[in-house]
């Protein structure tokens, strides 16, 4: 009798157990640098959050089970340098045709979070939020430009107007959008001074935010001086591998001031872009142990159609230079999430939002180019297989979550 009752109990328990999770990803290799996980684990999702991380979770414990054997499961990738304020302005990143939509360039590439890097200043930010940020499936944050007009023309004329740095107006917009604005951006300042950087730092101090600096390619002021005397701990210097900034010492190793800046907490971001990544700097810096703090794309029309392509491709370049895979993942998830003040992102932890990238690492002979046509050969390439945003599968390259159409009893609509 007891055996019969036990069998009845177990039979009744199975349906409840099967509904415990919405989705379980099984047999993947989890890389979560923040929580020191680098091992095969099963990951379960319920109600948009990570619900369990175990060596083994039964397939019938979830409404849907997906086998990702041979693949890597990482936090959703975080790209902190993009330009996505699309609009009708000609030759403009801010509300213009040089920006690209976030979702088509983020979601198919394992990216769940982006930060627009100063496309908008305070004047256009309400429109930017209403039309772009609030209507993207990708999670979007923003660095707001110190220039009120933002990046409104390709020749950077607007960004030279020191009279368009209204800290009161800027701070008002930041206060109204503090859930979205994660920092201040200054870029392309061509004058022989650091007015824009100093104003951005002043705004950062006033609003308790970091500054992202695009130093440019100008020889009329000292990058070393800016890094040593103006930037604060937590501030971000993007385009770290763009020449001709003097990052290397006479011995071909990272300059001492770069090492000192890192010790002080200055962050160095890739910001690949269409013209801001050279192997002539990246290789000697990386070979001598100076890895970037964060890997980002500087996504825009020119970079997406050039040698940058997408974030996994930039990650693959850093991998080809000798940075270990786990560190490349750290620089694409945990580190950038922390740099923008959202350390809760960029991790695989029970209770955290289920933003996940499932990645394949192909092995073979691959070539990677920089902006000058320089090439580095690599033996690995990172390929996105799945993207999960807040528990929902939003990209599935090989249809792992689909069913054979003849067997699925699918309802095909007709018109």
Where are these regions (language model features)?
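C-terminal cap of metal-dependent C-N hydrolases
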Residues: 28, 353-407
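Active-site core of metal-dependent hydrolases
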Residues: 183-305
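His/Asp/Glu-enriched, well-ordered alpha-helical/loop segment
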Residues: 280-363
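Metal-associated gating/positioning segment near the N- to mid-region
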Residues: 63-134
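Histidine-rich, glycine-flanked metal-binding segment
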Residues: 20-23, 30-76
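Divalent metal-dependent hydrolysis catalytic cores, especially in the metallo-beta-lactamase
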Residues: 101-129, 136-155, 177-192, 208-212, ...
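Bacterial N-terminal signal peptides
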Residues: 3-13
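Sec/Tat signal peptide C-region and signal peptidase I cleavage site
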Residues: 14-18
């Amino acid at each position: 009798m007891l055996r019969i009752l036990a069998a009845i109990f177990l039979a009744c328990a199975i349906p409840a157990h099967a509904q415990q999770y919405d989705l379980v990803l099984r047999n993947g290799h989890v890389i979560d640098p923040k929580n020191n996980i680098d091992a095969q684990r099963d990951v379960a999702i319920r109600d948009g959050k990570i619900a369990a991380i175990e060596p083994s979770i039964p397939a019938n414990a979830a409404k849907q089970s997906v086998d990702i054997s041979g693949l890597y499961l990482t936090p959703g990738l975080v790209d902190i340098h993009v330009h996505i304020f699309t609009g009708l302005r000609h030759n403009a990143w801010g509300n213009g045709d040089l920006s690209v939509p976030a979702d088509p360039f983020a979601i198919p590439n394992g990216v769940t979070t982006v930060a627009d890097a100063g496309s908008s200043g305070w004047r256009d930010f309400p429109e930017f939020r209403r039309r772009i940020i609030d209507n993207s499936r990708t999670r979007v944050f923003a660095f707001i430009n110190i220039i009120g007009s933002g990046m409104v023309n390709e020749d950077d004329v607007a960004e030279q107007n020191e009279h368009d740095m209204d800290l009161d107006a800027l701070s008002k917009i930041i206060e109204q959008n503090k859930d979205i604005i994660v920092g201040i951006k200054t870029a392309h300042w061509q004058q022989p001074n650091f007015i824009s950087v100093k104003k951005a730092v002043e705004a950062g101090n006033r609003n308790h935010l970091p500054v992202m600096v695009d130093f440019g390619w100008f020889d009329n002021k000292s990058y070393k001086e800016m890094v040593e005397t103006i930037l604060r701990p937590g501030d971000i210097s993007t385009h770290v591998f763009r020449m001709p900034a003097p990052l290397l010492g006479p011995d071909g190793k990272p300059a001492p001031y770069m090492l000192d800046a890192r010790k002080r907490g200055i962050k160095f971001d890739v910001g690949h872009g269409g013209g801001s990544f050279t192997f002539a700097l990246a290789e000697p810096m990386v070979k001598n142990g100076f890895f970037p703090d964060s890997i980002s794309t500087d996504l825009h029309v020119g970079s997406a159609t050039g040698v940058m392509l997408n974030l996994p491709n930039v990650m693959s370049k850093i991998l080809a230079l000798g940075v270990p895979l786990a560190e490349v993942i750290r620089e694409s998830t945990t580190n950038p999430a922390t740099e923008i003040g959202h350390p809760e992102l960029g991790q695989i932890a029970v209770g955290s939002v289920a933003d996940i990238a499932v990645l394949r690492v192909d092995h073979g002979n691959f070539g990677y180019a920089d902006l000058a046509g320089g090439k580095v050969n690599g033996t690995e390439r990172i390929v996105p297989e799945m993207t999960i945003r807040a528990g929902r599968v939003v990209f599935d390259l090989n249809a792992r979550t689909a069913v054979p159409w003849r067997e699925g009893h699918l309802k095909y609509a007709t018109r």
